[in-house]
Curated annotation (Swiss-Prot):
A motif ('HIGH' region) lies at residues 48-57. GO terms for molecular function: ATP binding; RNA binding; tyrosine-tRNA ligase activity. Keywords: Aminoacyl-tRNA synthetase, ATP-binding, Cytoplasm, Ligase, Nucleotide-binding, Protein biosynthesis, RNA-binding. This is Tyrosine--tRNA ligase. GO terms for biological process: tyrosyl-tRNA aminoacylation.
Length: 398
């Protein structure tokens, strides 16, 4: 009986190489999966360039879980080295370089957020690797060898570089290293498959070329769609405000998701859930509510999903996130550590300071690491959500 690969094909944009009938000598990914005598090594890399992961980032993670459930080994690469360069893909200017401490903090919060998605428990199903393990050891000779595998013309054909070159915006030489370093990750972990968004095809193809260069069998590329944000127009992005963060309060998640435009619902169900598409409710409003409930359940459990639904149906503001009035603060400027004690999120200002230093405090999803963070005026805080740990939230209101 032919193996069912519906889990593989759901919600993907492209698998490459994909042999045609005239290329019967080229192996397909389905054939490799069906005939392999060992678990395939399936790579997904993520650079910890910020504190948050949103639902758009979860799409390749969910596909990675699909490979795990099929018996293969997910190799999650934390790009602690490449994050300090920054992926130039789709960027019109050079990215700010991060400090080692920035990257370390972000990496830990990424792992915390993906635990509900990936199988961390079954032996042999997950490797978490940091690419500084091998990239930090490259000497000038090896770097020269990597650079010699590509031409400047090939690099300038990459969309982001091509646009910047045309507009005479600067392109720095270290940025040319990024695709080569991502590609070398595939060599270092001997990847059989690499997952990425549709914007990563160039980088994944570089990995295939480098594997050939180093005598390895080239990996397959599995490209996944870029998720459109809750505005229904542009790709999901924190900077555009059209995102749903994995670390958000269940009520906030529910509120945002029940407002997803009708035209996007099928894509959201296909990419973010395992529900059968042909069994969805006909009424768009019912589909929105089911989507919101299902995704909150995935990350917070059924009870939290039911509570968020009930709060939304009863008109609960932002899913009943508790509120604290800033009028209770006797004077400004005010330190964040004091505010944590005043809101009851921490027992005291001292505990608030310790929580900040430990990396356990967020404001609107952004990790705060400076214990002396101070706010000059109430309007800097109005409407924002303070978070301590995973489950304590407080909305700041006038």
């Amino acid at each position: 009986m032919a193996e069912n690969f519906s889990w593989l094909h759901r919600g993907i944009a492209e698998v490459f190489p994909q042999p045609t009938d005239a290329e019967s000598d080229i192996e397909s990914l389905e054939k490799r999966l069906a005939t392999t005598d060992r678990p395939l090594r399936v790579k997904y890399g993520i650079d910890p360039t910020g504190a948050d992961i949103h639902l758009g980032h979860s799409i390749p993670m969910r596909k990675l879980r699909g490979f795990q459930d099929a018996g293969h080994t997910a190799v999650l690469i934390i790009g602690d080295f490449t994050a300090r360069i920054g992926d130039p893909t789709g960027k019109s200017e050079m990215r700010r370089q991060l400090t080692e401490e920035d990257v370390k903090q972000n990496a830990q919060t990424y792992l915390d957020q993906v635990r509900p998605i990936l199988d961390f428990d079954t032996p042999g199903r997950l490797e978490v690797r940091y690419n500084s393990e091998w990239l930090s050891r490259l000497d000038l000779g090896k770097i020269t060898e990597l650079l010699a595998t590509m031409t400047v013309g090939q690099m300038l054909a990459k969309e982001g570089f091509a646009d910047r070159y045309k507009k005479e915006n600067p392109i720095f030489l270290h940025e040319f290293l990024y695709p080569l370093m991502q590609g070398y990750d595939s060599v270092a972990i001997e990847a059989d498959v690499e997952l990425g968004g549709t914007d990563q095809k160039f980088n994944i193809a570089v990995g295939r070329d480098l594997q050939r260069h180093f005598g390895q069998k080239p990996q397959f590329g599995v490209l996944l769609p870029i998720l459109i944000g809750t505005d229904g127009v542009q790709k999901m992005s924190k900077s555009l405000g059209n995102y749903v963060s994995l670390s958000e309060h269940p009520g906030q998640k529910y509120q945002k998701l029940q407002g997803v435009p009708d035209v996007l619902l099928k894509d959201y169900f296909e990419l973010l859930t395992n529900l059968p598409i042909d069994a969805l409710p006909e009424n768009p409003r019912d589909r929105q509510m089911l989507l919101a409930w299902e995704i909150v359940k995935q990350y917070h459990g059924e009870q939290a999903a039911n509570e968020a639904k009930e709060a939304a149906q009863s008109g609960g503001k932002e899913g009943a996130v508790p509120e604290f009035s800033l009028s209770n603060v006797s004077q400004f400027p005010v330190k964040l550590a004091y505010l944590l004690g005043a809101t009851g999120l921490c027992k005291s200002t001292g505990e608030g300071k310790r929580k900040i230093q430990e990396g356990g405090v967020r404001l609107d999803g952004d990790r705060i690491s400076d214990a002396d963070t101070t706010f000059q005026q109430p309007d800097e805080l109005q409407g924002r959500v303070l978070q301590v740990g995973k489950n304590k939230f407080m909305r700041l209101v006038p």
